Amino acid sequence: MGKKRSREEAQKEVVQNDPTVDKMDEDSDSSDSDEDMDIINVDFELFNYDKDIDFHGVKTLLRQLFDADAQLFDLSGLSDMIIEQNTIGSTCKVDDKANDAYAFLTVLNAWEHREKKPVAQLIEYLSDKAVKAGDSSLSVLPELFTSGKAQVGIVLSERLINMPAEVIPPMWNMMIEEIQDAVDDKEPYEFTHYLVVSRAYVEVESSLDQEEQKRKRLRDEKGLQYFHPEDEEMRKHAVGAGTYTFTKEGDSADSKRAFQELGVKSQGFMMLIEAGRFKQAVKAIGDCIGAAN
């Protein structure tokens, strides 16, 4: 393996969000409390993974990414693997490297790590879900995973739900550069395909209403929505994409009822992108998010 690259202080990517955080006046007795607010500018910085700092932050975000099925994976082992390849992908933090990650992005070589438990679990799980995802183009995934001729990069990315989308293009652009540097160093990152693992959701009638509407058994599912706006753009460049039901799915819609009139049914979501179209997909993310702001 070639010499690992590192991003030092001068190379850190700084993402300025101007502004992102609203600090509301906490005096609920004041008639003006709902209108008064202070604007806080927040700088987000990208860092290499650090084994002494990032384990718990990455593991927490992985648990969020895999949702109800997080219990099916060795998340500790997967977190260790992500952190060990510390020059591929980034964490996004506020203020200081020592803080927990607000977001992370990485890619794992499925073939290279196929015999390691965390990746073996991922391959088995994603192969099964790909067949059930409702897109015939994803049915090739099990074969791609088991063929040494195909090199599938499993892309894992997650962030706190209130993170601004502006942090995403720099993370993806930096990873593209790092992958190319790794390939130049003869490291195993020359992929034929990228499998982006994410989440989506649909709005559904909460089962809390069932007592009042016993005769109405069908749930009213609205259109598919994306937790990550970049997924909608990236999907346009995928050869296959689809959602899947979590194996350990619970009634997650009811747990979120307090925040909106309808429940939220979270689903797994995956996109298979050929390597030749991946850079174009990443560029489209930047174009889309930039145009929206």
UniProtKB/Swiss-Prot annotation:
InterPro entries: BCP1_family. GO terms for biological process: protein transport. Its main location: cytoplasm. Disulfide bonds: none annotated. The keyword Cytoplasm applies. Residues 1-35 are annotated as: Disordered. Residues 24-35 have a biased composition (Acidic residues). It is found in: Cytoplasm; Nucleus. GO terms for cellular component: cytoplasm; nucleus. Keywords: Cytoplasm, Nucleus, Protein transport, Transport. The keyword Chloroplast does not apply. Residues 1-12 have a biased composition (Basic and acidic residues). Pfam families: BCCIP. Involved in nuclear export, actin cytoskeleton organization and vesicular transport. Belongs to the BCP1 family. This is Protein bcp-1.
